[in-house]
A protein has these predicted regions:
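Core dinuclear metal-dependent hydrolase active-site scaffold
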Residues: 35-62
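Active-site neighborhood of phospho(di)ester-bond hydrolases with catalytic His/Asp-centered motifs
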Residues: 1-2, 49-52, 68-71, 105-111
């Protein structure tokens, strides 16, 4: 997306754990994503914006082949962690938007080929909506805190929390489920 071009050209900061694991990205000159891409074999890919894990994430649809190149949209059917900057409500919305298109197989950057990918994404969005509903009820009506809800639903933080300095955590997932919910003072969380 257009919004990413400056970041790609000028570089961007990464948390320490991310550059240790993946290295520091070098600045590159990039072009805006075209309305369609045609591969050398004639396959047409249509970009589908899918923010949630990142504000500039894009999936690619090869409708004639029933394929979705899903970037980080799928990863797992039941997420247990999110980074601090990820947005669960927007991710849910993006999955619904992608499911409005015709595909069966998901090509996932983390899981590889997911044959029943449409069903897998449907299961993921159902899980996330159910999780969000439980979190919102516990917070709003039962007056339970985010740390308490996290421990109840997902358990205590594990190694990923400590390695990432808290950037990648169960608590971030639970807190993100409240991003559009007023806190007890009436201010919108998130």
């Amino acid at each position: 997306p257009e919004a990413s071009l400056d970041r790609l050209r000028e570089g961007f900061p990464l948390e320490t754990y991310r550059w240790i694991v993946w290295g520091r990205p070098r600045p590159v000159e990039a072009e805006p994503v075209p309305e369609t891409l045609t591969l050398t074999n004639g396959t047409t890919l249509r970009p589908l914006p899918a923010p949630g894990y990142a504000d500039d994430m894009v999936c690619y649809l090869a409708e004639d082949h029933g394929l979705l190149f899903a970037a980080d949209l799928y990863i797992t059917p039941q997420p247990q962690y999110l980074r601090f900057d990820e947005n669960a409500p927007r991710l849910i919305e993006s999955i619904h938007e992608v499911l409005a298109h015709d595909f069966e197989t998901v090509l996932c950057a983390h899981r590889g080929v997911v044959e029943a990918g449409r069903r897998a994404l449907s299961e993921k969005v159902k899980y996330m909506e159910a999780l969000r509903g439980v979190v919102q009820r516990r917070y709003r009506y039962d007056k339970v805190t985010v740390p308490q809800i996290t421990d109840e639903i997902l358990g205590r933080e594990g190694l990923l929390y400590w390695i990432s300095g808290g950037d990648f955590s169960k608590r971030n997932l639970i807190a993100s489920c409240l991003d559009d919910v007023p806190d007890r003072t009436g201010k919108i969380m998130g």
